[in-house]
Design a protein with these regions (language model features):
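Structured, active/binding-site neighborhoods that engage oxygen-rich ligands
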Residues: 1-448
Length: 448
């Protein structure tokens, strides 16, 4: 598959946004406080964020995909388990942030970290032989590998190989099958939005006799027989593949079933897929994050509803040891991932991509549709005295055609009307994808 730069980076951008939308949606209803029944009885049919965050805190499901991929910054060639292990040691503060420090023999990641620190090399650090089968097959095998799928588009086998190597630092057995499955699905989503084809590509990268393949196929078979009742499928998972059958804090197999269920019953719709993954309970932010990446790539930017995308505002917070890396601008990171995608294919990086990755520099070009780069604007002027409409105009350079307009009431407190469509557009200076929008500001509402 030839990579057209703008099309490729927009898919990356959509996938990474999708991952973070899923994480943000699922995080407030994680276990152990939130059971399936409590989520159902409290929120019913979820169709939007259940918690309105002004600032969403760092989450391990975003930390891992960002920091473990930084092995590519320090090691040339195909990623190896030991290269990723060094990223673990280089970017984590022991006991603080990045992932769950739950204790040796309890938290898979904490156990692997201490193994590495004490001189146990990867992949032995995450092996069943070293840590036991239960610990090695927890959900972390698949929740930290989304970016490996994003940098290997339309090549599921290679994406799965990279993901297995990365996940083997801390996981083994079914944990590695989960890594391969999710990364392969993400990679396949660059060339098709067909959910069956995407899941087939994931299954092709894991042993047919594996428990992971069995739970995915069980869900698909149930869906074929009961295509309209995802809650019945969730009941089947509880009865036949539930937490009572698998040890540890958060085993990968029940959650693999949720990911498969959400993709089947979401039927290619981004929002419905992450919503179902969240309503299924168990590891809600992990599962919604994984399927959010897959569906984000498959559906593209146009498939991400504004009420989910806007609150992300192109910015996430991380919790690694390097403070300057902990505020991540998503559009800039998408260009960085695209650069790695070309490099890993052994192809020259197009100037359209390399020119937008500015090492050691803050650079916002707003070339990706709807990008905000984390910026917030608010009018602070008082209403126009004696004006029939109290109208103000704000003019600025905006990315794409999806805009936010702001107004200030008499009290001077900004009110935002996000996802408004600007009244008029005209092409701005290069690049041609920039548009100039004029937003009419009213004291009572924002009219665009």
């Amino acid at each position: 598959m030839a990579l057209e730069p703008m099309a490729y980076v927009q898919k990356i951008y959509a996938g990474f946004l999708g991952m973070n939308i899923g994480i943000r949606l699922g995080a407030p209803v994680e276990p152990a406080l939130w059971s399936y029944e409590r989520i159902r009885d409290t929120y019913g049919d979820i169709r939007s964020y259940v918690k309105d965050y002004k600032h969403f805190a760092a989450d391990d499901d975003a930390n891992g995909p960002v920091f473990f991929l930084r092995a590519l910054d320090d090691h040339a060639g195909e990623p190896t388990a030991q290269a990723v292990a060094e990223a673990w040691l280089n970017y984590a503060r022991e006991g603080v942030g990045l992932y769950w420090w739950g204790g040796y023999g309890i938290s898979t990641e904490h156990t692997a970290y201490l193994n590495l620190k004490n001189g146990v090399p990867a992949p032995q650090s995450g092996s069943i032989r070293q840590n036991g089968k239960t610990l090695a097959e927890q959900i972390g095998g698949q929740i930290f590998i989304d970016t490996w799928g994003l940098v290997v588009p339309a090549d599921p086998a290679r994406a799965a190989r990279y993901a297995r190597a990365a996940a083997s630092v801390s996981h083994d057995g079914e944990g590695l099958n989960g890594a391969a499955f999710i990364a392969a699905c993400i990679s396949k989503a660059f060339e098709t939005a067909d959910i069956d084809a995407i899941m087939d590509a994931g299954l092709a990268q894991i042993p047919q006799e594996s428990v992971y393949a069995a739970v995915v196929e069980a869900v698909r078979a149930f869906h074929r027989a009961n295509p309209d009742d995802w809650r019945a499928c969730r009941a089947m998972l509880e009865a036949e593949w539930g937490y009572d059958r698998y040890g540890g804090v958060c085993h990968i197999i029940p959650n693999a079933g949720v990911c498969a269920l959400a993709m089947c019953y979401g039927a290619g719709d981004f929002a419905r897929t992450v919503e179902i993954a969240t309503m299924c309970s168990w590891d809600t932010d992990c599962n919604a994050g994984n399927v959010g990446t897959i569906l984000g790539v498959a559906c593209g930017l146009e498939g991400l509803p504004a009420h989910y995308r806007d609150p992300i505002n192109d910015e996430i917070v991380l919790s690694g040891i390097s403070g300057y890396l902990n505020i991540l601008d998503i559009p800039s990171y998408a260009w960085e991932l695209a650069r790695w995608g070309y490099r890993l294919r052994g192809e020259p990086v197009p100037e359209e991509v390399s020119g937008r990755v500015r090492e050691g520099e803050v650079y916002f070009d707003f070339s990706l549709p709807g990008s905000t780069h984390g910026l917030r604007f608010a009018a602070t002027y008082p209403p126009a005295q004696g004006s029939e409409t109290d109208r103000y105009f704000w003019t600025g350079w905006c990315g794409g055609r999806r805009q936010s307009c702001f107004t200030s009431p008499s009290g001077g407190v900004p009110i935002s009307a996000t996802s408004a469509t600007c009244r008029s557009f005209r092409p701005g200076p290069t690049p041609a994808s920039r548009w100039k929008c004029a937003c009419a500001m009213r004291s009572s509402r924002a009219s665009c």
